[in-house]
Amino acid sequence: MNIMIFDATPHWSGGANRILLYSKELKKRGHCVAVCCLPESGLAKRIAEEHIPVYTLNPKSDINLLIVPKIIRLIKENNIEVIDICSPKFYWVSSLAARITNRTVILTRNVPYRKNGVKKQINRVLYHTLVDHIIAISDKIKRELVEDYSLPAKKITVIYDGIELNRFKQKRAEKIGVTPRHYVAAVISRLDENKGLECFIHAIAEITKKIESIQVIIVGTGSIETKLKELTQKLKVSSSVKFMGFRKDIPEILAGVDITIVPSPEEGMSMSALESMASGVPVVVTRGCGLVDIIVNNRSGSIVEPGNSHELAEGVIRLLESDYQQAGKEARAIVEEKFALPRVVTQYELLLEALQKHKTLTPES
């Protein structure tokens, strides 16, 4: 099958990682995969390294009709059968190109993107008339789509992100920069406003009052990095927090931590949380994260209310004071059962084959 995936994420992200993993696995299975993404994006570089065809376009706006002919040309030149659109900037232009060329088009929703007012009505037209199917990466996102847009549930398939399990080992390594008596908690995230990180820094101030022997590592870069560092100074927790910048050795880092935290008020699924669970490390997530349907609260992780630093602190303390190593084992078992890359890519293949079969039977649909 000839598949083209569209993405407009400028930075490396969980969504970009999902596209990379899916593309590699689909290529291994004999499919012809191409990716269209932003010039100079992290995804463009990583896809090219895997010798997968990559094309770069920048729509600049959600409805830039001037770019539609370029997308049509890419579709025809590569004999594309299925178009998978993963970013809003490509939703309209790629859907229109797919409709003009009578190709199967799906949208992959990996973050909530809940809208109101005019934007909600515009999206309703898109979802009901221009796309053949929608993939949601969590049950939570599917529920919200059905609720917000009155979509039939059968038009949405939940396919989770996939994990390369062999990259993540449960064997514990030496803890990062601390004595064995210390707890190590990690956040692995883009350091941006929407990630709940300021709330988490406030939670650290509360956590350290009860658990002095804790070291928090924050892995990632972003627009509010300086602001977060200043906040740790203001709250007098800088000695307990280590900013590690962007890192590629995530499996090695996770092997040396006890728990991870995803403080985002809204998160589709969180690749960093899945990687943590694959490493046998339990996670604290908010109810805004798609993992609420996966984690068993107080058994394989901890679930807290979003935007509440006290609740976040209590969730971290509760997990560390429990048998968090057993919670990590249960978290790993969940990932093995539901998120193994071959399993989820098979689900993706079967969906695309079914959509193509329907397209052949009803070519004008």
Predicted stretch roles:
Residues 105-133, 143, 150:
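A conserved, positively charged/aromatic
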Residues 36, 282-285, 295:
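Short hydrophobic beta-strand element within catalytic cores of glycosyltransferases
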Residues 297-298, 302-309, 318-322:
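Conserved acidic donor-binding segment of nucleotide-sugar-dependent glycosyltransferases
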Residues 246, 265:
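Aromatic "clamp/platform" in nucleotide-sugar-dependent glycosyltransferases that forms part
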